[in-house]
């Protein structure tokens, strides 16, 4: 089996778990709000960062919160690495949602609906699972 096939199989096995992790982040209204002490982008953005840290820990990664500006983690602690950037804040929920409300994610006909699904909470979780696959498969 090729590396690509192993990773594809790994992600297929963990698909449902990944979907639930994306939903966890989408449920947080992380639209930028008024700055608060220790929360430079507001309450929701700080809550999203904490949810991201919880996902790191759930999957066995050590996370760091940089004063509620950003969070990060590493796979193996080597000096040379690859940065994967994503953000957990979103634009306001807005009106006109026909399948669900912005922060109540659903999956229908193989598609997920909710604010941040594709920009950028879904891709952030996909990056986390890519790191998890690399680590768990020993690459």
Predicted ranges, named:
Residues 1, 69-73, 104-108, 112:
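Charged, low-complexity, helix/coiled-coil-prone segments
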Residues 2-85, 90-94:
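N-terminal helical capping/dimerization or prosegment-like subdomains
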Residues 81-139:
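Active-site metal-coordination/substrate-binding segment of hydrolases
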């Amino acid at each position: 089996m090729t590396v690509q096939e192993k990773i594809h199989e790994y992600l297929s096995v963990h698909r449902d778990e990944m979907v639930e992790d994306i939903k966890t982040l989408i449920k947080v209204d992380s639209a930028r709000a008024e700055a608060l002490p220790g929360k430079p982008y507001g309450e929701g953005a700080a809550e999203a960062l904490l949810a991201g840290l919880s996902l790191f820990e759930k999957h066995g990664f050590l996370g760091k919160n940089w004063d509620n500006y950003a969070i990060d983690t590493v796979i193996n602690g080597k000096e040379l690495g690859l940065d994967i950037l994503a953000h957990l804040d979103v634009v306001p929920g807005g009106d006109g949602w026909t399948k669900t409300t912005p922060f109540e994610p659903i999956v229908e006909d193989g598609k997920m609906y909710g604010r941040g699904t594709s920009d950028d909470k879904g891709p952030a979780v996909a990056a986390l699972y890519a790191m998890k696959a690399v680590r768990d498969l020993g690459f």
